[in-house]
């Protein structure tokens, strides 16, 4: 049905919108691919720093915050009854961890500041650069596929604006009166729908990709 992985996104979107079951053989759905999940995780943090997506990207790309460190942060947050983000912003127990955690918090805060007033497609571009994801995947053997998929997220963002009748330069982080939410949240809701696990079930009559 398609020539490359990135092209599958439009087909998946159409099938999901029309409640047509499908299966992808030998691959993952677009929004389930690692690099795409990384991008959407950062987007979710822009929308809500308290989101659990923090666990996915706090060390992606690698920045010295491994599993053991994350367990410490998680335990500390639970013991204090605060969120992971709150715990990161005021961690004082370990100077080395304070530096690493502070650097991550700064990345997210700077990213959000840079995205104020930008359209969704531009927001994705900022995320790719400021998160370090683009540079990280450029160093991978399969960089062409990875970068193409991340670039397709930009196309998906632009397409989502058109499909929902949103002005091309409408700010992604501001609440849209017609939508009742920000364009960013609307896009993330659509991404979650397209990544729904129900399409992985065994269905006799389905589109095979």
Where are the predicted features?
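Conserved helicase C-terminal RecA-like lobe
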Residues: 5-21, 33, 40-209
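Conserved phosphate-binding/catalytic loops in two-lobed NTP-binding clefts
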Residues: 28-31
